[in-house]
């Protein structure tokens, strides 16, 4: 009977519940009649609501980036006395520092080096264009300040907006170029003397260093040259002695031993043999048999033989001599008044 009563009660509940309201009423009655069943359904609904809330909260989260975007007020650009002054808040001490740059001569690399020298805590610094392209270190400051850019220091990104400046007209640009040329000439005229002195001092120091390296080699060369000169002189005197001996023998045979009729063919063959020897010298040396050149050749043969025997570094000696000659030539050109760009009147007075 209990089972039949339970089935009739369930049929009654199902007949009363229709749609959303019926479901709510059924739940209430079920909870009232069966407390355990109502608690379990209530916990299940609460769990589903919690899951949907967590998913919605995760979907509403934004993307997280590694770098921090800092307002542009931390980096400002102003012009003072015609020069751009960039104020940057340094990351280590969190204080502002001004950098005065020269728009013509300075570049992006100079500005970045100044930042790293001023704050040793900067590990990475770079400049990017608004679309994310890195600006080269060789780019001039005047070109950088024509448009907005991004300054990245470590993990901070600064959006910099330089003040817009009016571009010069063609006439003003030409006048500015003339002024730059005049200033450069004036600077050269005023500083040329100091530049000349510094360059002259540098060349003199180089000459002294080269001569100091050449001194020990020069002593060895002088000794080898002295021996080669001595041997060459002996060869020359030996040739003269040979010719004198030959003359004496021919004279003895011509006037004392035999007659001229017999010695004439002998002297002819001796003369012809001497001509053949000179021609053989030309074939071997590709030089004409002239006494000064023959003497110099013999001297060089003795010199190189002595240098090889003494292990003299002839190549290094020649390089040092060439370097000294070049330095002396540069020093002479440096002291030439025409190279100093002096006015014509002063050059005329010196001449």
Curated annotation (Swiss-Prot):
Record text on activity regulation: MCU channel activity is regulated by the heterodimer composed of MICU1 and either MICU2 or MICU3, which act as calcium-sensors. At low calcium levels, MICU1 occludes the pore of the MCU channel, preventing mitochondrial calcium uptake. At higher calcium levels, calcium-binding to MICU1 and MICU2 (or MICU3) induces a conformational change that weakens MCU-MICU1 interactions and moves the MICU1-MICU2 heterodimer away from the pore, allowing calcium permeation through the channel. MCU channel activity is gated by EMRE/SMDT1 via the juxtamembrane helix loop.
Effect of residue 123 to R: No effect on calcium uptake in presence of high concentrations of calcium. Abolished dimerization of MCU
Catalysis: reaction(s): Ca(2+)(in) = Ca(2+)(out)
Induction note: MCU transcripts are down-regulated by microRNA miR-25. Down-regulation by miR-25 may protect cardiomyocytes against oxidative damage in cardiomyocytes.
GO cellular component, one term: mitochondrial inner membrane
GO MF term set: calcium channel activity; identical protein binding; uniporter activity
Effect of residue 291 to F/A/T/K: Does not affect gating by EMRE/SMDT1
Mutagenesis / variant outcome for changing residue 97 to A: Abolished glutathionylation in response to reactive oxygen species
Effect noted on mutating residue 180 to A: No effect on calcium uptake, oligomerization and interaction with MICU1 and MICU2
A biological process term (GO) from this entry: calcium import into the mitochondrion
Name the record gives this protein: Calcium uniporter protein, mitochondrial
Gene: MCU
């Amino acid at each position: 009977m209990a089972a039949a009563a339970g089935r009739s009660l369930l049929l009654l509940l199902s007949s009363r519940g229709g749609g959303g309201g019926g479901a709510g009423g059924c739940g209430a009655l079920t909870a009232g009649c069966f407390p355990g069943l109502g608690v379990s359904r209530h916990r299940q609904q609460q769990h589903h609501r919690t899951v949907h809330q967590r998913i919605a909260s995760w979907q509403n989260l934004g993307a997280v980036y590694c770098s921090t975007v800092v307002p542009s007020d931390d980096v400002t650009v102003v012009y003072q006395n015609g020069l751009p002054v960039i104020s940057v808040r340094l990351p280590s001490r969190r204080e502002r520092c001004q950098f005065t740059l020269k728009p013509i001569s300075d570049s992006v690399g100079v500005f970045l080096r100044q930042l790293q020298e001023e704050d040793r805590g900067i590990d990475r610094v770079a400049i990017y264009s608004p679309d994310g392209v890195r600006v080269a270190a060789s780019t001039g400051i005047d070109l950088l300040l024509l448009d907005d850019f991004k300054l990245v220091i470590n993990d901070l990104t600064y959006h910099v907006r330089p003040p817009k400046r009016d571009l010069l007209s063609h006439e003003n640009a030409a006048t500015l170029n003339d002024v730059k040329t005049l200033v450069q000439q004036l600077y050269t005229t005023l500083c040329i003397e100091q530049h000349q002195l510094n360059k002259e001092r540098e060349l003199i120091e180089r000459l002294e260093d080269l001569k100091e390296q050449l001194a020990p080699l020069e002593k060895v060369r002088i000794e080898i040259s002295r021996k080669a000169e001595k041997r060459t002189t002996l060869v020359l005197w030996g040739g003269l002695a040979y010719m004198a001996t030959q003359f004496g023998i021919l004279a003895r045979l011509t006037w004392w031993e035999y007659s001229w009729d017999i010695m004439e063919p002998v002297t002819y063959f001796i003369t012809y043999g001497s001509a053949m020897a000179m021609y053989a010298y030309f074939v071997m040396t590709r030089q004409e048999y002239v006494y000064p050149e023959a003497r110099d050749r013999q001297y060089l043969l003795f010199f190189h033989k002595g240098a090889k025997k003494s292990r003299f570094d002839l190549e290094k000696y020649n390089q040092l001599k060439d370097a000294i000659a070049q330095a002396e030539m540069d020093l002479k050109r440096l002291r030439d008044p025409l190279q100093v760009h002096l006015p014509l009147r002063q050059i005329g007075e010196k001449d």
